[in-house]
Design a protein with these regions (language model features):
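ATP/NTP phosphate-donor binding region
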Residues: 1-57, 67, 102-103
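Glycine-rich beta-strand-to-loop/alpha-helix junction loops that act as flexible
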Residues: 10, 60-62, 85
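Short Gly/Thr/Asp-enriched flexible loops that form oxyanion-binding sites at enzyme active sites
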Residues: 65-76
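Active-site-proximal flexible loops/turns
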Residues: 16, 70, 91
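Catalytic core of DAGKc-family lipid kinases
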Residues: 5-7, 26, 36, 51, ...
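Glycine-rich nucleotide phosphate-binding loop and flanking beta-alpha elements
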Residues: 14, 64-66, 89, 133
Length: 163
């Protein structure tokens, strides 16, 4: 079994993405680091890593990145690690993970795992929630730049604009 692949969503930290990437390269020596360039790419990278025999795939991004990776590794015997870099980091918060990359990396290195349910809606799996209606539309229509400018408040503002 190969060890670890880290899938980084560089958009998750905006202008600080290069600094985050450098920090990950120092922390995770010996791991394979892949950065996504397009939406949906994390799922493809995760599936390929699972098929190549990697035992641990780390999502370095937000809840959207985690969701893509979960869909790539579903059905494979692979552990998911989380480095919360997104706007809300709901899944990481639900797991009680610390906010810092270094602290989360230590947890990953210690192989501390927690089983979670992997429900499925239509053809996609999800780990923390599935929304329909206003909440789903607000998440879908909140742009990357809006999230960068307003952070977690961006979703509330989008929901108010839609309603």
């Amino acid at each position: 079994v190969k060890d670890t692949v880290i899938i980084l969503n560089p958009a998750a930290r905006g202008a600080r993405a290069q600094r985050v990437r450098s920090e990950l390269e120092k922390l995770a020596r010996g791991s394979v680091l892949c950065a996504t360039a397009t939406a949906g790419e994390a799922e493809h990278l995760a599936r390929n890593a699972a098929l190549e025999g990697y035992g641990r795939i780390v999502a370095a991004g937000g809840d959207g990145t985690i969701n893509e990776i979960v869909n790539g590794i579903a059905g494979h015997d692979v552990a998911l690690g989380v480095l919360p870099l997104g706007t809300m980091n709901v899944f990481a918060t639900e797991l009680g993970l610390p906010a810092g990359i270094g602290a989360c990396w230590k947890i990953i290195q210690q192989n501390r795992t927690h089983r979670v349910d992997l429900p499925r809606a239509t053809r996609k799996h999800f780990v923390q929630l599935a929304g329909v209606g206003l909440d789903a539309q607000a998440v879908k229509e909140t742009s990357r730049s809006f999230k960068r400018n307003f952070g977690p408040l961006s979703y509330l503002i989008s929901a108010v604009q839609i309603a």
